[in-house]
Amino acid sequence: GLWKTLKDSAKSAVTNVAVTMLDKLRCKLTGGC
């Protein structure tokens, strides 16, 4: 239903943000930017 769709899209948005932030952090830590 609609609720599941909303939850799924929210979850994937949060995942995308987390992955992006982790990439930036790893970039800074390793100096591989």
UniProtKB/Swiss-Prot annotation:
Secreted as UniProt keyword: yes
Assigned keywords, A-Z: Antimicrobial, Disulfide bond, Secreted
Disulfide bonds: C27-C33
Tissue occurrence: Expressed by the skin glands.
Keyword match Disulfide bond: yes
Localization of this protein: Secreted
Pfam family of the protein (one): Antimicrobial_2
One GO process term, biological-process aspect: defense response
GO CC terms, sorted: extracellular region
Role noted for this protein: Antimicrobial peptide.
Similarity remark: Belongs to the frog skin active peptide (FSAP) family. Brevinin subfamily.
Name the UniProt record assigns to this protein: Brevinin-2Rk
